[in-house]
């Protein structure tokens, strides 16, 4: 029997025997708590400086996105206002004043 094949079946048997333990081992192997630093001590998580930098970057990104949305709405509103004024002027040019309006304007003079 091939020893490598026997080893593979043993590993597969361990994973299939108790899947919750295998899942826990897999989760523990890939967390930040399992990372070992050069000093040999396990690092508990990100340090305070990197958390501060991440928070500042998040705030900067949110400010840029907020300004983009605000200016987008502003310029969209201005564009619609300009178009509506143009449409009103277009309708006013096509409209002819009635003769009654002229009679009222000319009457008092």
Curated annotation (Swiss-Prot):
Membrane topology: Single-pass membrane protein
Major location (coarse): cytoplasm
Record has Flavoprotein as a keyword: no
Ranges that cross the membrane: 56-76
Domain of life of the native organism: Eukaryota
Positions carrying Phosphoserine: 98
Gene Ontology biological process terms, A to Z: regulation of mitotic cell cycle
Matches recorded under InterPro entries: Reprimo_fam (IPR043383)
Record bears the keyword Glycoprotein: yes
Key words, A-Z: Cytoplasm, Glycoprotein, Membrane, Phosphoprotein, Transmembrane, Transmembrane helix
Any one annotated GO CC term: cytoplasm
Glycosylated sites: 7, 18
Protein localization: Cytoplasm; Membrane
PANTHER family: PROTEIN REPRIMO, PROTEIN REPRIMO-RELATED
Family of this protein: Belongs to the reprimo family.
Its job: May be involved in the regulation of p53-dependent G2 arrest of the cell cycle. Seems to induce cell cycle arrest by inhibiting CDK1 activity and nuclear translocation of the CDC2 cyclin B1 complex.
Protein name: Protein reprimo
Annotated organism of origin: Bos taurus (Bovine)
Organism lineage: Eukaryota, Metazoa, Chordata, Craniata, Vertebrata
């Amino acid at each position: 029997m091939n020893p490598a094949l026997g080893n593979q079946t043993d590993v597969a048997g361990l994973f299939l025997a108790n899947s919750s333990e295998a899942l826990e081992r897999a989760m523990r192997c890939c967390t930040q708590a399992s990372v070992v630093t050069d000093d040999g001590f396990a690092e508990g998580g990100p340090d305070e400086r990197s958390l501060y930098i991440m928070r500042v970057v998040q705030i900067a990104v949110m400010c840029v996105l907020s300004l983009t949305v605000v200016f987008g709405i502003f310029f969209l509103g201005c564009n619609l206002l300009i178009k509506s004024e143009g449409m009103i002027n277009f309708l006013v040019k096509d409209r002819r004043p009635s003769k009654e309006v002229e009679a009222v304007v000319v009457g008092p003079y």
